[in-house]
Amino acid sequence: MTNEERSNFTGKLGFVLAAAGSAVGLGNIWRFPYLAAKYGGGIFLLVYILLALTFGFTLMAAEIAIGRKTGLSAVEAFRALDKRYGFIGYLAAAVPVIILPYYSVIGGWVMKYMWAFMSGDAKNTVNDNYFTGFISGTAQPITWFFLFIGITAVVVLCGVEKGVENVSKVMMPILVVLSVVIAVYSVTAPGAFDGVKYYLLPDFSKFSATTVLAAMGQLFYSMSLAMGIMITYGSYMKKDVNLESSVKQIEIFDTGIAFLAGLMIIPAVFAFSGGSPESLGKGPSLMFVTMPKVFESMPGGTVIGAAFFILVLFAALTSSISLMETVVSIACDKFKLGRTPSCIVVLAASILIGLPSSLGYGVWGGVKIIGMQFLDFFDFISNSIMMPIVAFLTCIFVGYIIKPKAIIDEIESSAPFKRKKLFEVVIKYIAPIFIVLILISSVLDAFGIFKI
């Protein structure tokens, strides 16, 4: 796909909504509230925002600028800037190839629960064995996995403007509205105020270096960094779009949805689950075990639960679309394939790679890799190992190989870059140290040596 043939977002709004859709995913909803509650409430929020304005801003701006400067996806972009460092692009490209299949498996779980709440089966979801019974099956997990990844493929097949951009323009506003409505309902419920205080009031007794580390890790994984996604979306960005302000708006979306997720979940858990912080949990247990019980206990819970899982589905879909679009873009650039054959190949490969994750809690449940289920292993390799390595190499590449000026000049081609001094300091000195700490803590966390 040459630069002349390359698709583009129609303007700034389309780019921001698509990139924000990529950044807003399951991690915003099932991990951020848990970490905020665990690590000091308001203190965690403050640390997270400060890191977003510095560390997150710098990494995202660098990736988008690399994409726009070269007009290429991750594999070819690094090669175009310096042939010796093309391997960074290959590492970045491997991340969405690994993540898309298992993420789509989880997306299928979300669709299953959304259907349960919309079809009158919500009361059964509160049973302790409902979730384990579902994921340990064969036909149902595979069916919902196929449906989710099929919808993703159809959107990507439609192209950047008619598919990715148009879907983002519909889903993101609905996602924001649903988040606000559910958050308002949650915080105004009887008994919810204790949860609001627990979430928002600073608790200095829980503040430590681990608070910063947890906020750093959450921000890093939440913003779709080091996956080639922002490079790909940057390559679709028009040259006259203000890159710096676009990044700020993406961060506002991402942080805002994460904040609202906390207001949706924590007060509701306090109000309808006996007010116990221990009830929170994170990940699938929060989403698929705790929340159905919360909805069952609240007035109008079936409707609120359906709205909640629609919201979560939209968050999952906008992220999976960006993952598949990135892999398809790489196939187009690297192998000179058209969009349709690229989509077919990526879909087929993702289904094959995703099947072990879909069946890993059932018929293949006895198979473990370094003591992990298939889905957990793929998550560990991509999130805990490859993403920090790719981000570290990107910082070194920008900071010391092509130099920050190359990126600053690209950003300033559309508007003055107000934070260029901050960008240079963070990309060269601060971000590499942060990323090494994230890598170490992620590996230790995965093996239960140091829990975050």
Regions inferred by a protein language model and the residue ranges of each:
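Transmembrane helix-boundary motif of multi-pass solute transporters/channels
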Residues: G11-L51, S245-K248, I252-T255, L286, ...
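Extracellular loop-to-transmembrane helix junctions
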Residues: S7, A36-A62, I88, Q140, ...
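Membrane-interface "cap" regions at the ends of multi-pass membrane proteins
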Residues: M1-W30, L59-I64, R68-A80, R84-F87, ...
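Membrane-embedded translocation segments of transport machinery
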Residues: T2-E5, F9, L13, E165, ...
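Helix-loop-helix connectors at the membrane interface of multi-pass transporters/channels
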Residues: T2, G107-S136, Y236-D240, S245, ...
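C-terminal membrane-solvent junction of multi-pass transporters and transport-like membrane proteins
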Residues: L91, G137, F335-L347, D379-I435
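Inter-helical loop and helix-membrane interface segments of multi-pass membrane transporters/permeases
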Residues: N3-R6, Y34-Y39, K69-L91, S104-G163, ...
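Loop-to-transmembrane helix boundary motifs in multi-pass membrane proteins
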Residues: N8, L13-F15, S22, P141-T143, ...
